[in-house]
A protein has these predicted regions:
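Conserved redox-cofactor binding core of oxidoreductases
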Residues: 1-94, 100, 163-187
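Secondary-structure transition/capping motifs at alpha-helix termini
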Residues: 72-75, 91, 103-105, 132-148
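Core beta-strand elements of the Rossmann-like FAD/NAD(P) dinucleotide-binding domain
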Residues: 103-113, 117
Length: 195
């Protein structure tokens, strides 16, 4: 999927890509694989150099983009080390949730909306455990269906990354650049040249 506008503002291409990375892209292109200059546009097919999330010469995360700007809002509260125990419905509308913090349970009423961000595995698990999902599968598990949404828990795809380790002659690599005097050069480049 395409990156959001907030996130896209900080996406940048590498300023000094490694010569072997460029060669890899050219080689892939020479055997028919298309070059992809912006895999954050929604099209992830092809060979590409990694894009980075950098703001003011520092790594910029999803937390920096979305979470930190709203931490001080009155209608937002971040709970850490908290487990969502149960979602309570009133006529298919979420009324409240029961959370667990340590050994304590607490009921929180929902005014407008609940945003569930528990990851690729836990989000559908929480929904299904609370009756949101494929009605037939929920019935098999003895879970009362509150909302029949067959897509919940479906279409999870892994993104495989294969690391290739090779020795090179007459070409420095990230491994050789992270040792000895080369490491000092890289530290200098980072702190003073912002590379």
């Amino acid at each position: 999927s395409a990156a959001s506008d907030v996130y896209k503002r900080q996406i940048s291409n590498l300023t000094t890509p490694h010569p072997l990375a460029k060669l890899f892209i050219e080689t892939a292109h020479s055997i028919g694989m298309k070059k992809n200059t912006d895999y954050n546009s929604g099209d992830q097919e092809g060979s590409f150099l990694y894009q980075t999330m950098i703001k003011n010469s520092m790594r910029w995360s999803a937390s920096d983009a979305y979470l930190k700007p709203i931490l001080s809002k009155k209608n937002f509260k971040l709970l850490i080390k908290t487990y969502l125990h149960k979602i309570i419905f009133n006529n298919k509308k979420i009324e409240s949730v029961i959370i667990k913090q340590g050994l304590n349970f607490k009921k929180i009423f929902i005014n407008k909306e609940l945003i569930l961000c528990a990851g690729a595995i836990n989000s559908p698990q929480i929904l299904q455990n609370n009756g949101i999902g494929n009605q037939l599968k929920l019935k098999e598990l003895g879970i009362e269906c509150v909302q029949n949404i067959p897509e919940v828990g479906q279409n999870l795809k892994d993104h495989y990354a294969i690391r290739i380790a090779m020795r090179t002659k007459n070409v420095s690599t990230f491994n050789t650049e992270s040792r000895g005097l080369s490491l000092l050069k890289e530290i200098f480049n980072y702190y003073f040249l912002k590379k």
